[in-house]
């Protein structure tokens, strides 16, 4: 039903693309991150929850955005299309396609951990499941969110006692709002970089409850930064903007913090393992929950996932992509290179590609079926 082209995944029967890489006439979009939402398309179909952030990011192309409720079916040239929660960020969706009795689901980016800032991931039964694999290696297993946010708040409180401002870096759309939701506002004021503040205001307008925040530049002007935590995109580290806060302790929240040496390479004082993607056992459990007989793997460490699923008896192959999700090669320690290397295949107009050549030991990476069920 879908084939890869030089513009991304194409549904020939419906004549539309899913998360295209280049401008097209009609795009069905999973979410508003830049590697999925492309400027210049004539028409976009997104979820109701994701419409505001999509329009904000599209600028002059925002007029082409149409939105549907989760679970609401649209028929596009005979193909029944519906969007279902992906749990990645506000409005993130999986795309379900049904045509002539065949059902495909495109996951987009997703996580199965609960998140108060977006609708929870929903397993959707299908014949073919296209899954991301950003953290598709057995070394990626997330600690509990309670533990992570406990560590973040303790770090912030310790910095406050020592008279330093705390800078916590996370991507401006999605990660930043999830971080804000987990902070303890009794410790001190929560300040936001401009890029974060705009997206945070859209989350609030969308009904997401978040602690009070203040625009960081306003706090700088009035010198009200004592004991504060500043939520900002990673690009601010080492900037003149950051130096205006005086003595600062820095941290980065990402799934990459699970890998040895990532904090040092990021040049931050602390690292917290918090991802908006599935980890290894969650990915395997999500595939099981769909009941899919065929799995196509993209956006990340495709080879190990394909090998594992093939060993389980599934028809699994990799789909080449221009993007690698949030892959950060700088975060991979040289000592982990043997399990973190994958052949990158150039996109082509041919049918979906075969698996890449990365290897893995399935016996060393079995997920516990009782502890790796998806969160619904």
Q: Model-found features: residue ranges?
A:
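Short acidic low-complexity segments
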Residues: 8-21, 72-75, 212-226, 234-242
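Short hydrophobic/aromatic-enriched beta-strand-loop microsegments
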Residues: 48, 63-68, 187-194, 313-322
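C-terminal regulatory/interaction regions
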Residues: 185, 216-363, 368-376
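Short, charged, surface-exposed secondary-structure boundary motifs
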Residues: 55-56, 76-78, 115-117, 139-141, ...
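Short, well-ordered alpha-helical microsegments
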Residues: 37, 92, 114-115, 176-179, ...
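Active-site-proximal loop/helix segment associated with metal-binding centers of metalloenzymes
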Residues: 87-97, 110, 114-115, 121, ...
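His/Asp/Glu-rich metal-coordinating catalytic cores
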Residues: 2-22, 26, 32-169, 174, ...
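Hard-cation-handling environments
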Residues: 149-231
């Amino acid at each position: 039903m879908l084939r890869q082209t030089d513009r991304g995944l194409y549904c020939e029967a419906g004549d539309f693309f899913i998360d295209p890489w280049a401008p097209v006439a009609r795009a069905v979009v999973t979410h508003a991150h830049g590697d999925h939402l492309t400027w210049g398309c004539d028409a976009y179909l997104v979820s109701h929850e994701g419409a505001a952030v999509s329009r904000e990011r599209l600028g002059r192309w925002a007029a082409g955005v149409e939105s549907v409720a989760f679970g609401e079916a649209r028929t596009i040239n005979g193909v029944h299309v519906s969007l279902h929660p992906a749990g990645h960020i506000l409005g993130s969706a999986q795309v379900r396609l049904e045509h002539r009795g065949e059902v495909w689901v495109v996951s987009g980016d997703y996580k199965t951990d609960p998140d108060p800032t977006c609708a929870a991931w929903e397993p959707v039964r299908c014949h073919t499941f296209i899954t991301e694999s950003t953290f598709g290696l057995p070394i990626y297993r997330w600690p509990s969110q309670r533990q992570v946010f406990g560590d973040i708040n303790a770090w912030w409180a310790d910095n406050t006692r020592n008279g330093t401002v705390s800078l916590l870096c996370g991507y401006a759309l999605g990660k930043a709002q999830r971080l804000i939701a987990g902070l303890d506002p009794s410790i001190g004021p929560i300040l936001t970089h401009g890029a974060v503040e705009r997206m945070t205001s859209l989350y609030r307008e969308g009904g997401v409850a978040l602690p009070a925040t203040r625009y960081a530049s306003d706090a700088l002007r009035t010198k009200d930064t004592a004991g504060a935590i500043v939520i900002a995109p990673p690009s601010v580290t080492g900037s003149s903007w950051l130096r205006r806060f005086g003595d600062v302790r820095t941290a980065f929240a990402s799934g990459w913090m699970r890998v040895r040496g990532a904090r040092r390479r990021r040049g931050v004082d602390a690292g917290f393992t918090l991802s908006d993607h599935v980890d290894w056992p969650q990915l395997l459990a999500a595939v099981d929950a769909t009941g899919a007989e065929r799995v196509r793997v993209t956006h990340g460490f495709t080879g190990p996932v394909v090998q594992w699923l093939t060993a389980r008896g599934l028809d699994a192959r990799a789909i080449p992509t221009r993007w690698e999700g949030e892959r950060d090669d700088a975060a991979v320690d040289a000592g982990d290179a043997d399990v973190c290397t994958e052949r990158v295949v150039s996109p082509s107009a041919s049918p979906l590609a075969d698996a890449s050549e990365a290897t893995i030991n399935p016996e060393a990476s079995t997920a516990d079926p009782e502890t790796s069920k998806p969160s619904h």
